[in-house]
From Swiss-Prot:
The gene is CHS6. This is Chalcone synthase 6. It catalyses: (E)-4-coumaroyl-CoA + 3 malonyl-CoA + 3 H(+) = 2',4,4',6'-tetrahydroxychalcone + 3 CO2 + 4 CoA. The lineage of its organism: Eukaryota, Viridiplantae, Streptophyta, Embryophyta, Tracheophyta. The keyword Transferase applies. It is an enzyme of class 2 (transferase). It comes from Trifolium subterraneum. Its EC number is 2.3.1.74.
């Protein structure tokens, strides 16, 4: 007779969850940040709001963003004028777009990740899909399963409406799935499309304008599994430890509400201040067991909610400017892509580490941290171990 303990042991993987491949995708439409205020105020018929446009121009100038990618083109917006008003009923039009585009963009990223992984897609056992862009049944996880031709008994997990911290959440869930299911190969997809949040400007809702200055579209996909197959699967990062916490006294700091007018975005408190005030505690909890207290000795992947968050974290921890280079580069080239951002930064870091001849995927360092920040205010922490190049 086999004991429950023996069954349990046989079900578990031996090694830590490992990122085995990364793929990214963006819509074809590239938007230059320098000229975006002119386009935005013209397409929303708001050119008469000159003071507001000047404020928006300053927001864009200070954003540290050079370009973004957006599904919404001038043609699409002209065909859907309700999206260009501030609070016009427009959810049907938005849903019609994102229900199709979110899985489609996710597929594009997933195909790249599967190709790099080098294994047949029939070996995918689990799928985690995350988006803050629209809600539907069956969900984007189901649609992606069909688009990719995955097996019908792939175990699916759909995460809707989590916001900007969710790039950390999907890694936390993927780690648990990979380590607790021997032989599991988890396809993780984050796909975000701003068609759900785009709206015209308002004098009375400046935090909405912040979102219009920062958000971009993108999808990222990973393959995660434990015990990589030698010579076939090539590890990129190992996931060692994860945590999620709600920052104290932060209720209402970041809110998003799905209404007839789409997803409205609200910043009600000093978000950079809340993050920087709580970052030290999160780092101590994560790295004290590793006897690491010098945070310049680790590599950094932080969700770039905006430049002010990165600036305050750097200042609080006395980080060297190069620590946030990969994070700032992704913010500059793509804007804030919500949950997909940290996965883009993982990809950027491993590529640049190889190009620069460094000895590990983590900028030549062994240990690193990935942070997600978002509604709640919720902080996701993932401790990563790099792999020798």
């Amino acid at each position: 007779m086999v004991s429950v303990a023996e069954i349990r042991k046989a079900q578990r993987a031996e090694g830590p969850a490992t990122i085995l491949a990364i793929g990214t995708a963006n819509p074809a439409n590239k938007v230059e940040q320098a000229t975006y205020p002119d386009f935005y105020f013209k397409i929303t018929n708001s050119e008469h709001k000159t003071e507001l446009k000047e404020k928006f121009q300053r927001m864009c100038d200070k954003s540290m963003i050079k370009s973004r990618y957006m599904y919404l083109t001038e043609e699409i917006l002209k065909e859907n004028p309700s999206l260009c008003e501030y609070m016009a009923p427009s959810l049907d039009a938005r849903q019609d777009m994102v229900v199709v585009e979110v899985p489609r963009l996710g597929k594009e990223a997933a195909v790249k990740a599967i190709k790099e992984w080098g294994q047949p897609k029939s070996k995918i056992t689990h799928l985690i899909f995350c988006t803050t862009s629209g809600v539907d049944m069956p969900g984007a996880d189901y649609q992606l399963t069909k688009l990719l031709g995955l097996r019908p008994y792939v175990k699916r997990y759909m995460m809707y409406q989590q916001g900007c911290f969710a790039g950390g959440t999907v890694l936390r869930l993927a780690k648990d799935l990979a380590e607790n299911n021997k032989g599991a190969r988890v396809l993780v997809v984050c796909s975000e499309v701003t068609a759900v949040t785009f709206r015209g400007p308002s004098d009375t809702h400046l935090d909405s304008l912040v979102g219009q200055a920062l958000f971009g579209d993108g999808a990222a996909a990973l393959i995660v599994g434990s015990d990589p197959v030698p010579e076939i699967e090539k590890p990129i990062f190992e996931m060692v430890w994860t945590a999620q916490t709600i920052a104290p006294d932060s209720e209402g700091a970041i809110d998003g509400h799905l209404r007839e007018a789409g997803l409205t975005f609200h910043l009600l408190k000093d978000v950079p201040g809340i993050v920087s005030k709580n970052i030290d505690k999160a780092l101590v909890e994560a790295f004290q067991p590793l006897n690491i207290s010098d945070y310049n000795s680790i590599f950094w992947i932080a969700h770039p909610g905006g430049p002010a968050i990165l600036d305050q974290v750097e200042q609080k921890l006395a980080l060297k400017p190069e620590k946030m280079k990969a994070t700032r580069d992704v913010l500059s080239e793509y804007g804030n892509m919500s949950s997909a951002c940290v996965l883009f930064i993982l990809d950027e870091m491993r590529k640049k580490s190889a190009q620069n001849g460094l000895k590990t995927t983590g900028e030549g360092l062994d240990w690193g941290v990935l942070f997600g920040f978002g509604p709640g205010l919720t902080i996701e922490t993932v401790v990563l171990h790099s792999v020798a190049i």
